[in-house]
């Protein structure tokens, strides 16, 4: 494992060591704390080149200005999964949270045993500032495998903003589902959900969009990932709840496979809890390709004023029905 940066120095954490023929890569060290800016977490080491998972990235250092970025996950070996990204550093006394690290890329053949990209790191939380952005999920290996999920955005406090969720990683070329988008963080303004990753070409689904974060005004749900040639579009994320303002809009559904497959459903709009406010609009359903059903539109969010419903996606050009419109 990589060493941690000294407290008060803002120095980055050390990188994890690479494994040999097989074995897991070493974890990255934590970044050092600092008033002027937290140090970045160290990168995870590469997994053994034949069989081994990448190491996890280190946590970013805390700071009263900006928490350090989490370290990226290590690359998986030939048959190994990518390592998880490190969490972003905490923002203290008005400082903002650091961004989460990206998940590592999966190995070339890892998808054949179900391994894929690493999970993105969570964005750093803040005690009186904006939350950090979640890290992107790692992409799967070149041939096959699932993409890693995006990290959730960090929570912000008081009159600040929750971090946006990280995007899901893309699947391998031939088959594998896209990674789910990370949820938006809580805040005065809720963070937006991350987009779902795109699927492989054959019989795979796009990743679901992340939920919008809860806040005075809700965050927008993430868009669903798109399918390849054969497969289904990912569902759009649900919009965040608005505690004292409007709810967030639902994310749009991903498109279905170009040759065959249904579009993803649009996400439901977030509810608005206070008097006089409006629920979020429902997301639009994803369209199908040549053959398939369009995704249903998302329902509008509840509230004193109902959110507008999303429209259903178009059916296949050769064969397929349009998706149903959402309800108010």
Regions found by a protein language model. Give the residues of each.
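Long, compositionally biased tandem-repeat segments
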Residues: 1-328
């Amino acid at each position: 494992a990589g060493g941690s940066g000294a407290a008060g120095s803002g120095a980055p954490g050390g990188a994890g060591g690479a494994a040999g023929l097989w074995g897991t890569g070493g974890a990255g060290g934590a970044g050092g704390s600092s008033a002027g800016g937290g140090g970045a977490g160290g990168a995870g080491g590469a997994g053994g080149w034949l069989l081994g998972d990448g190491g996890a990235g280190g946590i970013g250092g805390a700071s009263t200005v900006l928490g350090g970025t989490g370290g990226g996950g290590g690359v998986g070996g030939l048959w190994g999964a990518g390592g998880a990204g490190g969490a972003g550093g905490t923002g203290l006394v008005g400082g903002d949270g650091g961004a989460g690290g990206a998940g590592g890329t999966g190995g070339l053949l890892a998808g054949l045993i179900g391994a894929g990209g690493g999970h993105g790191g969570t964005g750093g939380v803040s005690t009186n500032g904006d939350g950090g952005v979640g890290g992107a999920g790692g992409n799967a290996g070149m041939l096959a495998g699932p993409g890693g999920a995006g990290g959730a955005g960090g929570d912000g406090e008081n009159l600040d903003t929750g971090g946006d969720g990280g995007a899901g990683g893309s699947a391998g070329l031939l088959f594998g589902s896209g990674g789910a988008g990370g949820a938006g963080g809580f805040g005065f303004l809720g963070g937006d959900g991350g987009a779902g990753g795109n699927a492989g070409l054959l019989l795979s689904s796009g990743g679901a969009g992340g939920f919008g974060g809860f806040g005075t005004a809700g965050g927008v749900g993430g868009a669903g990932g798109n399918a390849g040639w054969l497969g289904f579009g990912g569902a759009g994320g649900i919009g965040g709840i608005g505690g004292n303002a409007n709810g967030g809009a639902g994310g749009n559904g991903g498109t279905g496979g170009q040759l065959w497959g249904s579009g993803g459903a649009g996400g439901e709009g977030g509810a608005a809890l206070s008097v006089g406010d409006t629920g979020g609009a429902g997301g639009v359903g994803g369209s199908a390709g040549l053959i398939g059903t369009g995704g249903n539109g998302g329902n509008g969010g509840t509230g004193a004023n109902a959110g507008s419903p999303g429209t259903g996606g178009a059916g296949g050009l050769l064969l397929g029905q349009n998706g149903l419109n959402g309800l108010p």
